Design a protein with these regions (language model features):
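A glycine-rich beta-to-alpha transition motif near the start of alpha/beta enzyme domains, typified by
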Residues: 15-175
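Phosphate/diphosphate-binding glycine-rich loops and adjacent basic-rich segments that engage nucleotide
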Residues: 165-192
Length: 192
């Protein structure tokens, strides 16, 4: 195991532009669930929120969209995913980001996020961690990057000072004018 030190970070000026500290070196850890291989990852922190970016060694999820590969991950490798983010090498608040080749030609990289419960459609602080890891690994073509996620295409930029801004997928309305009874005779209406 290699000892890692985080880089210095400063407080953000804007809520969408946050500095991300990254480890100087990645850590290699063997997982029996991966066929005895080694899964390579780097740990990063976005304002204290941990992200483990998996760069190599994860079992092949085959072809297809990131959403399709996310389903394969959930059905075939949920125990392995839990092992990656849980104790003793992780903890319950950790999010992992599996870097993949994108299926969508408009995207630079593909990524599937997961936590100790299962896959996530998207993760804001995880996206910032991924962008910083890609920069540190020399895998960014410019200061802008597009990521294919199960939730859709996410765009991000990284500034010279390390601040990262994310343009997330659009939110949508599942149901309009939903009535909920809080107590007998007391109704509230809202959208989901």
């Amino acid at each position: 195991m290699k000892t890692c030190r985080p880089r210095e970070a400063t407080l953000p000026e804007y809520w969408i532009s946050i500095p991300v500290s990254s480890v100087v070196a990645g850590i290699e850890t063997p997982f029996a669930g991966a066929g005895g291989g080694v899964i390579h990852y780097s740990d990063l922190h976005t304002e204290g929120e941990p992200t483990r970016v998996i760069t190599a060694g994860f079992p092949d999820l085959g072809d297809g969209s990131i959403s399709e590969r996310c389903q394969k991950l959930q059905h075939n490798f949920s125990d392995l995913c839990s092992g990656i983010v849980r104790e003793p090498r992780g903890h319950e608040a950790m999010v992992a980001a599996l870097l993949l080749k994108p299926a969508d030609p408009r995207c630079d990289h593909g990524v599937i996020f997961f936590n100790n419960v299962g896959p996530l459609g998207m993760c804001g602080h995880g996206t910032m961690g991924v962008v910083r890891a890609l920069k540190d690994l020399g895998k960014l073509k410019s200061d802008r990057v597009t990521l294919e996620t199960p939730a859709g295409i996410v765009e991000a930029t990284i500034e010279d000072d390390g601040r990262i801004a994310v343009l997330n997928v659009e939110s949508y309305c599942y149901r309009l004018d939903v009535e909920i009874e809080l107590s007998p005779g007391e109704l509230v209406t809202g959208d989901i």
